[in-house]
């Protein structure tokens, strides 16, 4: 049921798009109960949006002001009768032109117009077949898969890029885009581009043929190149051969020489094998001679000298005493010399060790007993307290015989003889004085080398040390490691010597074991270190260290004196100035 648009004239402007076609709702069709009008058709009609009947059309048909019309392009218009017409002012591009009679097409050869149709004039190999432009081909040009092709046979070929190429093999190749012939001597390409043979003497080219001029013994015959031979050269089975007689012989292709001793072949050279006494010198076989032999006018003789001479074909030895050569060479011996069978009959000294003699190393020495000593290489009498040498060098009672000994001083005397064995026997002189002052001992010490390495410091002698070891009563132990020898002077001071009173209790002179625990070499307070100078020279500093109870046994005591820093004074004598030290006593 249609409704008049006017009955809704009083509606507000927002309802101006009211659709008078059922279901009348212009705003929201999602809730419209779709009831399709019975007059819709898919031929030119459509329901869009739902519930609304509309025309279904496409360009050039459009609506304009609610009316169907057409989109008109350039050159098209509607006349007064509503008919489509073409205007005369159509814009065209070449080859078209707009004339009063209509559109005109301009063309040029090979295009033409025949029977009011545009056509194409052709000339072989082009043609038109079945209204198509075609190409007339003949081998080797072909048409394959609508493409021009080229049929090839070897050595021509086409590569993957469609390029025509030439298959080559040696000696042909391509150089600089030109076909090139590779040659090896003697073939060459001459300046004219022709292939020729390079020749060198004796080969040459004559009458366009290779020829070989020959000289004796070569010759050219109808059979070919040959050689003229004479004895001992022959030709056997087409090969040169050599006729030989002993000692020459040929084996296979080798000429050899048969040899027998003493001839040999060494390094492809014939040589003479020589035995003892013979040698080859230059090109001569000569006699080899050693020391004592010579040649005199081509005769080998004995060359003698130094007490030897020849007489009657014999060598004679002339000797003087103590030698004897009357039979075998021997040595005349005097008293005290014998041959020692146990040492391969070496000559040795025959001494009586019971009469005060002894061996010291390889030397005969005096075996000094008690009361005797050595000083500066001399045997001397050891004088005790109260004894002196008078003006006649006789032993006499000294004025100090009534001098009491000092129980507060232990010493070695102020200038003792060598009394220490450090590197070798009796090689040093130790001067030591210990004076007790209440609970303190003040000491003076010096050490002087008298022989061996201590007179000539070696690179291995970097430190010199002296050990004095005492037992639990403070008595000096004269065995190792004590450096003082058993016969050294040591005891209470009496005048300038040592008292005959034996030290039975020296604890008042011993380092305190509470202050210097034993052993204690690593504890700083158990050491006394001072700077001194080698030989008293202030340009030669060395270090002296005194260690207290450093190497002692369980119940004993010790004093150790060490001088270090000697490596800077190689080959110089070792001697130290007097140095003082102090320590706390045991009692």
Curated annotation (Swiss-Prot):
<comment type="function">
    <text>Forms spikes that protrude from each vertex of the icosahedral capsid. Interacts with host receptor CXCAR to provide virion initial attachment to target cell. Fiber proteins are shed during virus entry, when virus is still at the cell surface.</text>
</comment>
<dbReference type="InterPro" id="IPR000931">
    <property type="entry name" value="Adeno_fibre"/>
</dbReference>
<dbReference type="InterPro" id="IPR000939">
    <property type="entry name" value="Adenobir_fibre_prot_rpt/shaft"/>
</dbReference>
<keyword id="KW-1233">Viral attachment to host adhesion receptor</keyword>
<keyword id="KW-0167">Capsid protein</keyword>
<comment type="similarity">
    <text>Belongs to the adenoviridae fiber family.</text>
</comment>
<dbReference type="InterPro" id="IPR008982">
    <property type="entry name" value="Adenovirus_pIV-like_att"/>
</dbReference>
<keyword id="KW-0946">Virion</keyword>
<keyword id="KW-0426">Late protein</keyword>
<feature type="region of interest" description="Disordered">
    <location>
        <begin position="1"/>
        <end position="23"/>
    </location>
</feature>
<keyword id="KW-1161">Viral attachment to host cell</keyword>
<dbReference type="GO" id="GO:0042025">
    <property type="term" value="C:host cell nucleus"/>
</dbReference>
<dbReference type="GO" id="GO:0046718">
    <property type="term" value="P:symbiont entry into host cell"/>
</dbReference>
<dbReference type="GO" id="GO:0019028">
    <property type="term" value="C:viral capsid"/>
</dbReference>
<comment type="subunit">
    <text>Homotrimer. Interacts with host receptor CXCAR. Interacts (via N-terminal tail region) with pentons.</text>
</comment>
<keyword id="KW-1160">Virus entry into host cell</keyword>
<dbReference type="Pfam" id="PF00541">
    <property type="entry name" value="Adeno_knob"/>
</dbReference>
<dbReference type="InterPro" id="IPR009013">
    <property type="entry name" value="Attachment_protein_shaft_sf"/>
</dbReference>
<dbReference type="GO" id="GO:0098671">
    <property type="term" value="P:adhesion receptor-mediated virion attachment to host cell"/>
</dbReference>
<dbReference type="GO" id="GO:0007155">
    <property type="term" value="P:cell adhesion"/>
</dbReference>
<keyword id="KW-1048">Host nucleus</keyword>
<dbReference type="InterPro" id="IPR000978">
    <property type="entry name" value="Adeno_fibre_knob"/>
</dbReference>
<keyword id="KW-0945">Host-virus interaction</keyword>
<protein>
    <recommendedName>
        <fullName>Fiber protein</fullName>
    </recommendedName>
</protein>
<dbReference type="Pfam" id="PF00608">
    <property type="entry name" value="Adeno_shaft"/>
</dbReference>
